[in-house]
Amino acid sequence: MKKLKRLLIDVLIMCLLFSGGYVYSYKKINHKGPSLSVIQKELRDTTKTLKGAFSSRKHVYKKETTSKTDSKYKSQAEMLKTLRHDLVQREKKIVLYIQSKKKLSGTLASDLYHQSLAYTGVANEGDYLHFHIKKVNMVTYLTIKDSQYYYKVNYTVDYRTSLKQENEVTKQVKAIASKVQGKTTVEKIRDLNDYVTAHVTYGHTDDDQSYSAYGALVNKEAVCEGYTLLFNRLLMEAGVENRVITGTAITRGEKESHAWNIIKVGNVYYDHDVTWNDSSLPNLYYLRGDDTFKNNHFADKEYTTATFVKTYPLSPTNYQNP
């Protein structure tokens, strides 16, 4: 019976393959966004996975007709711009249409997704956007007709914050950042570091807001991810280049998942842990050199590649005022 069922399925697939245009669909890909556990103060929080996992992919075929003149089909560059825009706008359902003269990568959906989260220098994009996405499901359909490839890519996205909450963050961040305009880079870092440590309390609730800039800024309570994302957003709004780094850190002899920033001053970057700066011994991890910082902070592999290290060179020594 099983053999007969399998034979019928194979026959059906072959019929679809030779019946003109057809859709080549990748099974849904489930990519869980980074959600960090926290390690400062009481270490009360549960550890969540840092790295997303992709499910195995299988192929199914479905007949579909598509006009090759359909204006909704754009280039990859246009679709990348659209995807980034829709993610910033917290769209939960995103559909992209891409036309190509040649077959594109089987990882098209995930490739576009990761490219949309790359560093751009815009305050609410890049790392800030990346770490505010909780989960995304991806499905890709391919229609082949008249030697043209028509891709339809569906994204279903779960965010840590809503557009309304992000609008409130933007409003408050702009007001705070405006107070440091005209100051030097180091003065901006100092003042914004002090703002975060003075206004945010370390703590954890069961909702996603503890892991967001909104939780840190509006609720005034967050874990390390919330601290780091708020600091990232404030610095970017003030014109100070920085990246969010994830990894592990050791405190009280225990290694836990953690997040911090690297901040550009001059031609090099310095490690900076705003969460740990909010302690009874403040600012011990302020613009630190990597030679000492790496004694208890260990970046994930993606931040230790030759390309990343070359792009973001870390100072081996602590920052010294000129």
What is each of the regions a protein language model found here?
Residues 3-183, 299-322:
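N-terminal accessory/pre-domain segments preceding catalytic cores
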Residues 6, 203-206, 219, 256, ...:
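Repeated polar recognition positions within modular binding domains
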Residues 83, 164, 219-222, 251:
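Alpha-helix capping and helix-loop boundary segments enriched in small/acidic/polar residues
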Residues 163-216:
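Secondary-structure boundary elements
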Residues 203-214, 221, 242-254:
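Catalytic cysteine-centered active-site loop
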Residues 226-293:
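Hydrophobic/aromatic-rich core segments of domains that either
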Residues 283-309:
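Short, surface-exposed secondary-structure junctions/capping segments
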